[in-house]
Amino acid sequence: MLAFLILVTVTLASAHHSGEHFEGEKVFRVNVEDENDISLLHELASTRQIDFWKPDSVTQIKPHSTVDFRVKAEDILAVEDFLEQNELQYEVLINNLRSVLEAQFDSRVRTTGHSYEKYNNWETIEAWTKQVTSENPDLISRTAIGTTFLGNNIYLLKVGKPGPNKPAIFMDCGFHAREWISHAFCQWFVREAVLTYGYESHMTEFLNKLDFYVLPVLNIDGYIYTWTKNRMWRKTRSTNAGTTCIGTDPNRNFDAGWCTTGASTDPCDETYCGSAAESEKETKALADFIRNNLSSIKAYLTIHSYSQMILYPYSYDYKLPENNAELNNLAKAAVKELATLYGTKYTYGPGATTIYPAAGGSDDWAYDQGIKYSFTFELRDKGRYGFILPESQIQATCEETMLAIKYVTNYVLGHL
């Protein structure tokens, strides 16, 4: 056994070697009351390098909301002076980002093998997709639906008992590279499917009657970059013509109101929509797969973080979907079910009004393809840790999310 347990010391330097160290950086939360406050934050963002965590961009700030953003150490005093001089109410969520990053891992001594209760790098996840498939050939098959900009295979797991013409649910994780709890959930879902099939009645029924297409990591290149260079990286790693700025926001790259609102045409921005809809190899691979399997896919679930929300269309427009009442009731019930385990409170509603307008999202695109049950899950937390959710919260987060996913699945199964 010891021959297979190679222990390595993991520190921030080794997990993110030769990259950003984040020493002394802070995460602020500002209370925004009115348009004047919004204008002030626009002014701040134009003069300082601000990394917006929630919302994703300064352009998405709304009155009567809170705004979370990261500030580099050398800009801290200037930002604090600006906030105080303009009487903007704020608090510091994270006082030293490096310290929180170091504490994210439960232990500095880690096994090199896969663990469902720890964050796994892409090399480990890739090996896991092969292993979990080979160990469960009667439940799981693996295919590569495309490659990333840097040539990594985009693996999709088909989870379910083999059968003809089965309806399916598509679920993806890892759109935004820094949202590590998202990646962890797709792995946890597969774990639950494997462990509880034949023992737990709902999962057994689901896998007998449905297939789950599970995409563990879409933005593989970006995810690798968060482990090797910059933990706060969000976008893909594709090059852009005419600039040294790298990457596109994959969740602004779908042909759903593409680049009309809540998205940027500037390749240097975190919400850059790309040179065209589906310009990214990753989003094109996902969209092609769904288009090719549209007759069987009955629900689309995309997992993100953070803010504890279940969202449904639309985000690119304030219009409501045709089955708004049904989606609202389903989201409400799923949120209630989720809270039964640990009391975690989620909000729910249409994306544009519940969180912020954002064009080019995969959930809106899937809905417009005719998949009428389309949801975005924004997992824990509400900002205490933000994208740096500790490993100690992986299990609880995944367990409660499973309740909501299973509730939605059961509903979809009953409304085919």
From Swiss-Prot:
Keywords: Carboxypeptidase, Cytoplasmic vesicle, Disulfide bond, Hydrolase, Metal-binding, Metalloprotease, Protease, Secreted, Signal, Zinc, Zymogen. Substrate binds at residues 176-179, 234, 251-252, 305-306, 356. Its cofactor is Zn(2+). GO terms for biological process: proteolysis. Disulfide bonds join 173-186, 245-268, 259-273. Residues 16-110 form a propeptide. InterPro entries: CPB_M14_CPD, M14A-like_propep, M14A_act_pep, Peptidase_M14. The active site is at 378 (proton donor/acceptor). Residues 118-412 form the Peptidase M14 domain. PROSITE patterns: CARBOXYPEPT_ZN_1, CARBOXYPEPT_ZN_2, PEPTIDASE_M14. It is found in: Secreted; Zymogen granule lumen. The keyword Transmembrane helix does not apply. GO terms for cellular component: cytoplasmic vesicle; extracellular space. It comes from the Eukaryota. It is an enzyme of class 3 (hydrolase). It catalyses: Preferential release of a C-terminal lysine or arginine amino acid. GO terms for molecular function: metallocarboxypeptidase activity; zinc ion binding. Belongs to the peptidase M14 family. This is Carboxypeptidase B. It comes from Sus scrofa.
